[in-house]
Every structure is written in C-alpha cells, then in structure tokens.
C-alpha cells in the first residue's frame, strides 16, 4: 500500500478515507478524515457534510501528530504528564486527543491518519477499524 519512497500512495489514502467513513457511519457519527504522508504533509482529506467545520483542522493535526512521532495521539496524555515533556503541549499542532494513528505498513510508518467528529473513543474506534480493514498495523499503545 506504500510506494518505494516509504509514503502511503494516493490510492491507499483514498481507500483509507472510504473505510473510515464506513466505520464512522456504522458507529454513528459524521467524520472529517485526514491522511498525511510519512513527512506529515497532507495526502488526502474528506469531511462528511454533517461534520462540523472545526473537525477539518483537528483531523489534519491528529494525522500530523501521529505521523510525526509514529504513535497514536491518545498516548500523548500520559507523556504530557511528565514535566520534562509538558512544554510540548504548547505546540499549536500537537494533538493529545484520541483519533490519530500512524499508518504502519510492514513495520514502517508511511503516513498519519486523523479522524475527528465523534467522541475521542469513537474516533479511535473508527481509525482502528479502518486500518485493520485495509491491512495496516494498529499500534498497541
């Protein structure tokens, strides 16, 4: 699903967005979905008609955070409790809210996935379902 350049392909990014919308509908919410390449640059994006406009920026920042550090965004809550790491909370794009996951293909981070629109638990659930459906690895964090 990735290219030799170690980033997610456009086709895989589009399939991931479709899988997220399917999962979100099944769970019961309208989502904004962002996919970045391995460098955190936007690769694909879509916002459901019923998703609030703020979800667009949040989804992109979740994807960026996940791609940047190769860990799910919800794990940042524990890290930010450490006084030596806490200053990172002031970074304007860092998202410590569930719904952002690195896209792991054959052990390599090929991008980031960010979902916004449901509760953080719903965003996480939709991300995990979509990643699993397309054969990407879901980090154990």
Language model: regions and residue ranges:
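Flexible, solvent-exposed loop/hinge segments and secondary-structure transition points
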Residues: 1-141
């Amino acid at each position: 699903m990735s290219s030799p350049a170690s980033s997610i392909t456009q086709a895989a990014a589009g399939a991931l967005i479709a899988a997220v919308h399917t999962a979100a509908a099944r769970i019961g919410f309208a989502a904004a979905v962002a996919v970045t390449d391995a460098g955190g640059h936007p690769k694909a994006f879509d916002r459901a008609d019923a998703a609030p406009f703020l979800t667009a920026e949040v989804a992109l920042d979740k994807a960026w955070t996940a791609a940047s550090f190769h860990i799910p965004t919800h794990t940042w809550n524990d890290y930010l409790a450490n006084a030596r790491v806490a200053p990172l909370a002031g970074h304007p794009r860092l998202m410590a809210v569930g719904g952002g996951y690195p896209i792991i293909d054959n052990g390599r981070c090929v991008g980031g996935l960010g979902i916004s629109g449901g509760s953080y638990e719903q965003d996480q659930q939709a991300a995990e379902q979509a990643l699993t459906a397309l054969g990407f690895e879901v980090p154990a964090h």
